[in-house]
C-alpha cells in the first residue's frame, strides 16, 4: 500500500466506526424535492440495464459525463461494465451537472457542499417489485469514494424493506445519511415511487472533516 492508501484507510476507518448508517445534520424538504423531480418524468431510464433484466429500478442523473440528463451510461455497474464490456469507467468522469442539478435547489445546495470532490450523483426510483439484491459497493481497506443517501416518496416501513448488515434500517425522509456500503445491503419495494438520492463523494481530509463535523451532536 502507498502512503496515500494508508492515509485514506485511516480516514475510512474513522468513518465506519461512526456506524453502518449515520444521520447527518443535512436536511432537505423532501416534499419539495419530490414535486420538482416530477418535471423529469420522461427522463428516467432503467437502472443497470446492461447487467440485469429490467426489475422496475430507474435512474435519473444529477451529474453525468456530458451534463446531458439523458447521458445515462454511468447508471450501470462499473464493475460489470469493466469486466464484461471492457469499458473503463471512473467516478470522476461523471461529475458534470445536468439540468436536474440546476432545477432543484435543495439538491444543488447539498452537492455544492462536497464539490468538486464528488463522483456520480443520481436519483433512484424503485417501483413496485423493484429491488437491489444483497451486495457490497466497495472493497478494500482504503476505498477512494463513499456514499451519502437520502430517501423520500413512499418510504414508510410498509412500503419497502432495506437491510444493512442483516438488519432492517429505515432512514428518515429528507435526512442525509452516511452509508457504509461496504456492508452487505439490499432493498425491496412493495410500492411505486420509492426515491433515493445517491451522492458519491471522494474520500479525503476535507470530505472526512465535513462528515465528522456534521454527525456530532450539537
Residue ranges: model-predicted function:
Residues 118, 133-148:
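A short beta-loop-beta micro-motif enriched in histidine and acidic residues
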Residues 186-190:
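Asparagine-centered strand-capping/turn motif at beta-strand->loop junctions
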Amino acid at each position: 500500500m502507498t502512503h496515500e492508501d494508508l492515509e485514506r484507510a485511516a480516514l475510512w476507518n474513522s468513518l465506519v466506526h461512526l456506524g453502518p448508517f449515520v444521520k447527518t445534520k443535512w436536511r432537505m424538504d423532501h416534499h419539495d424535492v419530490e414535486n420538482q423531480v416530477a418535471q423529469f418524468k420522461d427522463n428516467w431510464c432503467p437502472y443497470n440495464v446492461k447487467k440485469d433484466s429490467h426489475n422496475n429500478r430507474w435512474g435519473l442523473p444529477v451529474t453525468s459525463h456530458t451534463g446531458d440528463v439523458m447521458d445515462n451510461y454511468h447508471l450501470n455497474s462499473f464493475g460489470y461494465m469493466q469486466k464484461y464490456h471492457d469499458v473503463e469507467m471512473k467516478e470522476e468522469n461523471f461529475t458534470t451537472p445536468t439540468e436536474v442539478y440546476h432545477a432543484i435547489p435543495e439538491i444543488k445546495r447539498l452537492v455544492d457542499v462536497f464539490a468538486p470532490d464528488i463522483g456520480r450523483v443520481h436519483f433512484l426510483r424503485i417501483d413496485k417489485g423493484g429491488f437491489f439484491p444483497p451486495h457490497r459497493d466497495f472493497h478494500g481497506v482504503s476505498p477512494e469514494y463513499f456514499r451519502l443517501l437520502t430517501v423520500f416518496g413512499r418510504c414508510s416501513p410498509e412500503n419497502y424493506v432495506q437491510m444493512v448488515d442483516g438488519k432492517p434500517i429505515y432512514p428518515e425522509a429528507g435526512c442525509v445519511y452516511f452509508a457504509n456500503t461496504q456492508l452487505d445491503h439490499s432493498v425491496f419495494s412493495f410500492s411505486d415511487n420509492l426515491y433515493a438520492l445517491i451522492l458519491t463523494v471522494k474520500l479525503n481530509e476535507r470530505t472526512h472533516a465535513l462528515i465528522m463535523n456534521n454527525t456530532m451532536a450539537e
